[in-house]
């Protein structure tokens, strides 16, 4: 499932067909949650839907209620994923005091009256409790397609330009002067409003407006948010206090697709392309043999091309900030590609060589013999994963692809996988 790609495609179709839709976005999680902040789901009024914001537990309710929840505009709902019987806290649990219905289902910033839940019956409240045993809370922003379009267009532009953008989404605004949560107050703080923090403009604006374009409260808030730097996360929940107004934001670093460059166009590359595309990666397949590098053989790949072995410029361009898998089954091809890549270890994020360890060591020795200063390859060799992939068991191209994808995922997401730590744990294929 290409979650983001499928959402973008369906949004375009719905707009062209004049069909309304609701975008549901996870804006905050507490405790255990299946999806992280930023996960999205698009629900069309004709019944079509794509994307997931949970493991399938919340989706039936969300599909059922999406249009009802957004009848008065964007709003945030909070879903409990604890046990069937929920308690307010540990002390009350011991005393046998259960949560009330209002504790189990939190309305938030939707501009609705206090009795707005009157349309929900007992069965609905039982459903909203979601006795899943995960002991978490999932905050979900609901908005109609017209409101969400600027965000979807921004995501599409990020994927096209390969340039990340930092966006802040307002998920709550408490105006203490007016005693309560508001969906729109005198400073035009609208739930679901989004700001491009890189350019100081609201999403959907044609040009950068600068700090002075915002109201006094919002201008100070935007300035504080712009100084907020995401560390190792792509999304963060941020609270900003500004005078009598407290705002809560989801700050996201919208990233381009992860990119995979596969050098080699053999049959064993096909399942690797499929697995990468299932995760919505951008996949390029190259080979110097034009009869192998064809669109007919790799219809799922984003780019398929034949490039000469001595085309250094194209190889470095395609491998920039990407994961690279050398899988040609050809000594001459692997030697040529590896020689170029080992000299530029800072150009890519991952480099793996297919084949047994002794084969790769032979390639490295042959490359080193042609250099006046072989030590220049040390950084590249240190970064090289060989043999490529984790040894997970199984046999055949699919098992190989699974091990390769697992290792690349771990490296690209800076995770220490349980089987990592030594080249001896990878498969000698």
Q: Where are the regions a protein language model picked out?
A:
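Short amphipathic alpha-helix with an adjacent loop that forms part of the alpha/beta core around
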Residues: 310-319
